[in-house]
Amino acid sequence: SRLARRGSGSATRSIFGGAVIWHRGHDDASSFAEPLAIQPSLPLRMLVVTVSAEKKAVSSRKGMANTVATSPYYDAWVASNESLIEPMITALAEDDLALIGKLTELSSMRMHAAIMAEEPPFTYFLPETLRAWQLVQEQRALGIPAFATMDAGPNVKILTTEPYVDILLTALRPVFGDRILSTRLGPDASIITKEQFDDTKSAIASQG
């Protein structure tokens, strides 16, 4: 995970399967990821809504570097995010989807608040980004457990569980069509053959 981190923070978390914690650390040796001791048993699913497949006008690396350097909210976001870690570990261990979702949304939106406050002001949000968030909130108001999150980009990921995937797809497709990918917690990273890759790609493409 340390080697993967040098390419991407997201890659750090993707080396291991299941729910993973990335230790911030203070140098190369202490900044690494590892699986959580207690994994959730919930049938977690994530719907990835592709708002835009275009190259980002500002790369994640450049955008976040400028956030660190110029946003007055950056330090507050880091402190806030660190305060969410232990509650999230507990929520995952206790299969508390409502709390998992709440903490996920808080972390994501506070990060984007810090990004918007950088100099010069900037946002990754597009009009359809906001529409996706609105749809999630509308579904949650109807009693559907759905929670939105984003990384440094315009696309929206929606956390839910298996029984509600079709309901959410029905709500999302009139706006986003086939730009929705349904995923779940994956296994450890591994080396696969081209045939295995093609089979996996086909299986993903065939998902509802």
Language-model region placement:
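Gly/Ser-rich oxyanion-binding loop with an adjacent helix/lid
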Residues: 1-43, 208
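C-terminal nucleotide
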Residues: 36-208
